[in-house]
């Protein structure tokens, strides 16, 4: 970590683009910063800020290990990473939901009961094994988690799994694959996170940025200030 720079890790993609809009609204420099460019670092010496453009799944790692002081990441990614960081502010954008989904016909045959649905095969396909395992363990439902890297909706059709755990925004993809939501897990939005050591050592400087982002995001209440 470069000591004279405050380093902020940003995710590539739509979430990163929304994050840049928030940073600009908070009065932070973003001129020329692009989350889809080949350039992966952007430095502004005058205010002493550097941005790292990362894969969304890597943002918690950069923050946890001190390569970045702060980071913006989806709660879904943060929960799956299990990173030891401070979760400071719910930024409110990038909304999606974690859900358990099943084939419509099987759900009806099971009397719309998750326990009945799991009476036979207990395979669950997901890109988020940590989140999925936690959900079923908390309910005392033994399952076999199968990790996939994409197109989770294919798993029930191919006979690989009976249930899936995935994130949805509109639910359109589930409907197109004749899947229905059978249980909510939690809602996800973008979060501002901080390296635990950096937040304590550079508390005053980081707090000024945190408060500016809170105001820009319309967060008038207290910071979340939890760890994962």
Swiss-Prot record:
UniProt pathway annotation: Amino-acid biosynthesis; L-histidine biosynthesis; L-histidine from 5-phospho-alpha-D-ribose 1-diphosphate: step 1/9
GO molecular function per UniProt: ATP binding; ATP phosphoribosyltransferase activity
Subcellular location: Cytoplasm
Record keyword Hydrolase present: no
UniProt main location, coarse: cytoplasm
Similarity field: Belongs to the ATP phosphoribosyltransferase family. Short subfamily.
The protein's name in its UniProt record: ATP phosphoribosyltransferase
Originating species: Moorella thermoacetica (strain ATCC 39073 / JCM 9320)
